[in-house]
Each structure stands twice: as C-alpha cells, then as structure tokens.
Amino acid sequence: MDQTILACSDSGEFQEYIPKSIGHSGEGRRHLAITVLVFNSKGQVLLQKRKHKVFDNIWDFTASTHPLHLENGEDETLEQATERALKVEYDIKSSILLRNLGFFNYFQKIGSLCENEHCAMMVGEYDGILNMDPSVGYEYKWIDKKEFLEDVRNNPENYAPWVREGVKVLKRIGFLAS
C-alpha cells in the first residue's frame, strides 16, 4: 500500500496529502522529508549505505524518511517520523533527544523517478546498540566528522544528493566543525 505523505511549498507550507509514489514519479511533487544524522559521545557520525530505488548502494546519513499522514487522520511530527525510522532501520527503541537544525530543498531526477523534497535536517546523540534491518541498508559505519566531511568533498558521487545538501546546513551552523 502506498504511504500518504505531505506535499508542501518550497518553504514547507502544507498543500495537500499525496501518495508517496506521486511525490517520487516524473518531476514529482515537493513534499516534506526528513534526514537524520546520529552522532555518538566520541564525536563520530553514523552513516548508512542505503538500499534505495533511485540512489541505491550509496552513503546516506543515518536514516531518511517522510512524515506520514496516518490512518487516524493525524500527521506525524518530525520527531515521531524520525523515531519511527530509527526504530525500523536500527531497532533503536530508546528515546533520543532530537533537534531540527534547519531545512533544505533539493530535486534530483533519475529516469522516471525523482527526489523532490523539503527536507528537515534532524540530529541526535546515541551510544547504544545498533541492529540494522538488512532490508533497508547494506551496511553502516561510524566515522569521524572530519573524515566524513573530507570524503563528501572528495567523493560526492558516493553520497545521496540530500547528504550533500544536508552537509551545507550542518556546516553553516557549525555542527560539523572539528
């Protein structure tokens, strides 16, 4: 069954509910999305080599998802959607203090599919056990922030387009400063 997501303007203003497939087909429709970067007490960031219809087998932030319009008529908050993604993708059940560090827009088309998103850049700290669901990713790794930034700069093709855009937000506010 197709999930229902929230179409929005470039500034994130809600427009209407749409099937996820509409948001990602052809030119797509701009819609609300989330990417989350988890870091640990050592200052490392958690990356995932994602299984993805459009951007398969490249590095992503820790997790990415969309706030959903639920069957009960409510919309997930950014925090609820982020917690859902971390639970589904890594079996993280404990609460993580999440912060939204800002939004960015991006569009990328590959064949008949696309990404057309107004994306929240969420972050949170976690030092617990990870059990990645093999249906969502090939592997994960903890990496030093500085090494991560150097690799994104030197090998941008190894990263999802939203990672490259999200890094700009993180650098602008000083989150990825050494």
Predicted regions and their residues:
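Acidic, metal-coordinating catalytic segment for phosphate/diphosphate chemistry
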Residues: 1-42, 50
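Short, solvent-exposed loop/turn elements at beta->coil junctions and helix N-caps
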Residues: 21-25, 103-109
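Conserved Nudix-box catalytic region and its N-terminal flanking loop in Nudix hydrolases
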Residues: 23-34, 44-84, 88
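A structural signal for short, well-ordered beta-strand segments
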Residues: 36, 100, 120-124
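Nudix hydrolase/Nudix homology domain
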Residues: 59, 63, 105, 113-178
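Helix N-cap/coil-helix junction residues
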Residues: 91-92, 175
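A short coil-to-beta-strand element that immediately follows conserved catalytic motifs
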Residues: 93-103
